[in-house]
Amino acid sequence: YFREKNPDVKIVAVQADPTSRPGGSEDPQTIDGIAPFGDPGFPDAAKAPFIVGFDYDEYIDVKGEDAYALGREIAQTDGVFLGQSAGAALHAATIVAQRPENAGKNIVVILPDTGLRYLSTNLFNEDFEV
């Protein structure tokens, strides 16, 4: 859809880095709901159907600690209640926006979830340090 509207659009996918994937490590800061785009070891059958064959230009690995920290910051400073994957998407968008070749360009990010499902997780646990 996006390329039909603008063939020059760049699409960047976001994935949890290997240490931040559920079941990928003992890290308590996993990012749920983001399938690995660029991991050839992750079978297509385990991915959501829209991901298989998805046309993107690059993918960015995001660490759980970065997604959690930005999710908490945005909740405190802007009152926007983000979930884990939304924090990851926003973190990746800031990486893309900081690239010199993107100066003056519009960066659009889709925030795929809300923080409501994560109230009982480490994302919003005040005693858990990022």
Predicted segments with their positions:
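Short, loop-centered acidic/histidine patches that primarily coordinate divalent metals
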Residues: 85, 112-113
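A short, acidic, amphipathic alpha-helical segment used as a generic capping/interface helix at domain edges
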Residues: 67, 74, 90-99
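Surface-exposed, flexible loop/turn segments at secondary-structure boundaries
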Residues: 19, 115-116
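Catalytic phosphate/nucleotide-handling subdomain of diverse soluble enzymes
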Residues: 94-109, 120-130
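Active-site/ligand-binding loops adjacent to catalytic centers
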Residues: 4-84, 122-130
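Short beta-strand segments
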Residues: 13-15, 108-112
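Surface-exposed amphipathic alpha-helices with a cationic face
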Residues: 1-6, 97
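Short glycine/serine/threonine-rich phosphate/pyrophosphate-binding segments
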Residues: 85-93, 118
